[in-house]
């Protein structure tokens, strides 16, 4: 992993300059690993060993003195398709890498490709409960959503399960979000991490003009109403899109990280921002080369000044840094 140190140090120097003497909430994000490698086998002739990049995430968390780490889903269950025993091996490696992090908790927001063949209930819940044992996380029993309070920095971090039902968010989860957002202590801010971007601009080209799911619209309206009434949401962080996006909608900051998935030219909307090159593992030019680089975003929130920043580690470097108010 030493070859990635230069990327971490480059981002850290930019973060340090922005941070100055201010206290802030810090968390590195990784998403859409879509790993094709199980043990030492190559599946479907695609050598795509991205799970090990969680170790880069862990190194970044330690270097930045992070408050937690976030994985926004789609780690590689069914793209390419795997047999049940391979999925179990893949999950074991996922947990092993995350468990080795010196920074806890690890907030995992399951993606649409994580729910194949019941993988989420079978492995995810138990695995991350063990990893985060002892952390002050509030989550309904047997659910894959909840929140983590960082009391010293007055920040509540929600992690959501946006593929819980056919309607994306169950009524129970929606009620949980609403009640615990509006009941935050005075002066606190909220951060949300989840797999899917709920904005239209986060969708692929063929979905751009389809109606948005009702619960996406409903959730955005909840966020916007909270902000209109004086509440503070630092940002909504997601993956899934496979391209970079930053959008302020009705006073709410949305950030989508490109991650490792890749997107073909015909599927990328005109506004999509991409760090890309020819990728030998995929034999196409729609992703960066994960054998030579990495793609991790480090988010930082100055809760005392209502400022947010995102610093790119790896592909694209400072080109994809963002600073904004909330």
Go through the PLM ranges and name each one.
Residues 36-44, 75-82, 158-168, 203-210:
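Surface-exposed cleft-lining segments at the edges of enzyme active sites
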Residues 303-326:
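Acidic, His/Gly-rich catalytic cores of divalent-metal-dependent hydrolytic chemistry
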